[in-house]
Regions:
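Catalytic active-site module of serine/aspartate enzymes centered on a nucleophile-bearing elbow/loop
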Residues: 299-338
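N-terminal cap/lid segment of alpha/beta-hydrolase-fold proteins
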Residues: 27-48
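Flexible "cap/lid" loop of the alpha/beta hydrolase fold
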Residues: 157-200
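Conserved HGGG/HGGXW glycine-rich cap/lid loop of the alpha/beta-hydrolase fold
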Residues: 46-103
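Conserved hydrolase catalytic core segment
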Residues: 129-175
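Alpha/beta-hydrolase
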Residues: 186-268, 272-276
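Active-site loop/oxyanion-hole signature of alpha/beta-hydrolase fold enzymes
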Residues: 95-138
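Conserved loop-alpha-helix segment in the C-terminal half of the alpha/beta-hydrolase fold
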Residues: 260, 264-307
Length: 338
């Protein structure tokens, strides 16, 4: 799932299920995409969400909306993907109770179905007929739920850093812990036990797990533009109460409302040719788990970002943007009437 907001994006390509050709980089890589064409506050169940658009709806190629992780994260992790707006409108938003959106703080709103309905409310308010939905981590589950519920409005669905099943995720996490050095793995297990050691003992072991699988230490440092953007548009930032209520206090076990969550069965209900899975080479979303999901989705594709973890969008920004750009261009070209 997600712990720290990620600001940048990533691109490195190692397709497994199908060949994906690397697309050209943006025509103007120096452009300041941090300036939105328009900003909106859109009414949804429970309050209003903040939405920004780069580009003009109805102009260019099919729009794309980017769905952040968490639960409780923000749009900041998609910063460099705004360069996709040289071809199509790019829509970013903060889910209710996160970032720049309203924070009613009502747990009654913290249900997957409401988050999916939130997406549809945004689509209607912006006047979008069809769009690509790219969801990362928790956002990938929302992207799949949306694509299954609204196929007529979904040009494609990208399930990035794929999370579709809590039980699969926890199983994968336990296997990843086993791959850490023995002393680190033993400390994490002790910290998750009935009588955990002091926090000073647990924090370094948890950090070692995150460095390996959730945000590798060699990722690029945020630029001054990114830091300025975060200061201006970070809002209230990550919402730990929302995360803890839906997931739990640690990455290693789910004790919240998502404990029994599993939407992998929806893969059989969507058009596999419109689905792509994307993960990092060292992703917390393990490749064998995602290959199982791929097998349930005939016609879907899988791309792996070399050197990337769950935060591959921040770690390999140039490779990730090309993956998403090429995918959407190919799906647009294959669409009837294009």
């Amino acid at each position: 799932m997600m712990h720290k907001p990620l600001f940048a994006a990533a691109l490195a390509l190692l397709p497994l299920a199908a060949q994906a050709q690397t697309a050209a980089l943006p025509t103007d890589p120096a452009a300041d995409w941090s300036v939105a064409t328009s900003e909106h506050r859109i009414a949804v169940e429970g309050g209003k969400v903040w939405v920004r658009v780069n580009g003009v709806i109805g102009q260019g190629e099919t729009p794309v909306i980017l769905i952040h992780g968490g639960p409780g994260g923000t749009h900041l992790g998609f910063g460099t993907l705004l360069s996709l707006a040289d071809q199509r409108p790019v829509i970013l938003y903060d889910q209710l109770d996160s970032g720049m959106s309203d924070h009613p703080g009502d747990p009654a709103n913290w249900k997957p179905a409401r988050f999916v309905a939130e997406l549809e409310a945004i689509r209607k308010a912006l006047g979008v007929e069809r769009w690509h939905v790219i969801g990362h981590s928790w956002g990938s589950a929302l992207a799949l739920e949306y694509a299954a519920a609204y196929p007529e409005h979904t040009a494609s669905a990208v399930l990035s850093g794929t999370f579709l099943s809590t039980s699969h995720w926890i199983t994968g996490t336990n296997l990843l812990i086993r791959d850490l050095p023995d002393d680190v793995a033993a400390t994490i297990r002790a910290c998750e036990g009935p009588t955990p050691p002091a926090i000073e003992v647990c924090e370094p072991a948890t950090a070692a797990f995150y460095d390996a699988y959730n945000g590798r230490p060699d990722r690029p440092a945020p630029t001054s533009v990114m830091l300025a953007y975060r200061q201006r548009y970070g809002g209230k930032g990550f919402n730990p109460e929302l995360y803890n209520t839906m997931w739990g206090p640690t990455e290693f076990r789910a004790s919240g409302s998502l404990a029994g969550y599993d939407v992998s069965g929806l893969l059989a209900r969507v058009d596999g040719a419109k689905v792509m899975f994307v993960i990092g080479q060292y992703d917390e979303a393990r490749i064998d788990t995602v290959q199982d999901f791929l097998a349930l989705t005939p016609g879907a594709e899988l791309a792996v970002v070399p050197g990337g973890s769950h935060a591959f969008i921040a770690e390999r920004p140039e490779v990730a943007e090309a993956i998403f750009r090429d995918w959407m261009n190919r799906k647009d070209a294959a669409a009837p009437g294009h």
